[in-house]
């Protein structure tokens, strides 16, 4: 146990030194950062190539890149600028993004979402235990950490939250590579302001698994402030960033002046967002269904998944309409689901959660010593800020001040991350942006009596380095135990323990005589290094808070990187096969529909019985081939079957149009272009 050394002597020289130490940092921060930026540009950034900015969200993710001084938010292969943070596993393939979410209701136990709620946490953590009750997929315990258990490639597999997050990052990376036409290796990734060190480390590990060097972890509200502040640099502004996303809620108070962004205070709730609003509506609609049909769906994960999907759509609709109808065909036991949900009912179900978001707003104002009237702007970030009641409550809290809506709330964080990425890669036009971030929780060590002694206060600008002198608690004490904690409680045991280490071989001396200097170094990513040095002997020990907090080992990361590459190869091989199969199946069904069309202009009305029978037989044979060889046939075999069907159909359709329209008919019934829309649905 340590005790704080209370004996201080300040000589004239020491006082002068202290004054210099205080004055110099005040005089030179901008000069120092400018020099660092120049050094980076000259020596390091060439090796980075293009650096991308990724908003790795709980429910949706988004990627941006700075090109020629302008940020581009990139669309995925479905044309969407936000991608669901979903990963699904089937007997033959892995799906990520829209394709994974679209099949969730039919593959409930093997579709993984909300993984951000688990990353960097221990299995026994209260939050993990709470999540396990709600998540439809299986969570197991491995080495004290949660892992996802799924069926994939006809075997049971377990994946860590870092691996699943790595798969989502791989998707975002591939979106950027498709756009840029080159390989991407470096990124800036955002996290909630309230993520602790373990969660930040785990996010970096996920980037490594995805083949990305994560140059910087940036707080989401800070990234949003960058997006907001680029064109508003005249004078000083105090801004509240109110970030209500799908799974997390963060509030930050920032000061923006002359391109300098300083986070003054942060607060939030790691388990509050749009999905929680959805859950309350799902619970309500489930009870309504039970009353009407006497069927309890609470244990039916497939039904809950269907209802959850439709509830999310309804919630979005209610942001612009007063009511909407939720309809699901064959919901349970062949019974259709049909209910009207009004905006008023949605607000009634969630009003307590909406009001709960105001507490962190009060907290950041209190932490920074600000009044409501000191706030110049309110910035809305996250899709859930589109909810009218949320905006109304927030504006009422600020005595009628209107929230700024100049940023697309879904894209603001990725935009800011892309700007920071541009800074790190040396992009023109962004070199004058300075980012001052803060640590979200107080950091300290346990001293005599179990007290939490603070070294770095909550909301201290980072990077930072703080030292303090401690001493021994007993005579001739040879060893001191340094136990590192994060949190706001007075006693160390009530806070989150980050790690521990010992400083040994302290020479015998009365208690209070040895001088043990403990130094906390917190880097720009919020990663902590703690060092203890015996000033008498010069001996020191240190720890970087990683494995003691559940971070993956290097061996684990290397293994996961290899597996990620292997899965990428499998994905590539399967993609060609699936596209060929889908192309054949869609063509056969399209042709079947044409043959059955007996309308005046339909193909069926123009065919004689023999030709119709020939086509029916060929289509039936094709569909049977698909059914019998769904998993076993190769891409080439599916393509051969399609050509066989085209060879049967083309002469018949050509004959109908006198042979002159053969090309048109072949395009209609045979060309790949005719069913591209089906091939890329990935259903």
Curated annotation (Swiss-Prot):
Its EC number is 3.6.4.10. Its main location: endoplasmic reticulum. GO terms for molecular function: ATP binding; ATP hydrolysis activity; ATP-dependent protein folding chaperone; protein-transporting ATPase activity; unfolded protein binding. Residues 419-519 are annotated as: Substrate-binding (SBD). Residues 145-299 are annotated as: Nucleotide-binding (NBD). The keyword Endoplasmic reticulum applies. GO terms for biological process: ERAD pathway; fungal-type cell wall beta-glucan biosynthetic process; IRE1-mediated unfolded protein response; karyogamy involved in conjugation with cellular fusion; post-translational protein targeting to membrane, translocation; SRP-dependent cotranslational protein targeting to membrane, translocation. It is found in: Endoplasmic reticulum lumen. GO terms for cellular component: cortical endoplasmic reticulum lumen; luminal surveillance complex; nuclear membrane; perinuclear endoplasmic reticulum lumen. Belongs to the heat shock protein 70 family. This is Endoplasmic reticulum chaperone BiP. The lineage of its organism: Eukaryota, Fungi, Dikarya, Ascomycota, Saccharomycotina.
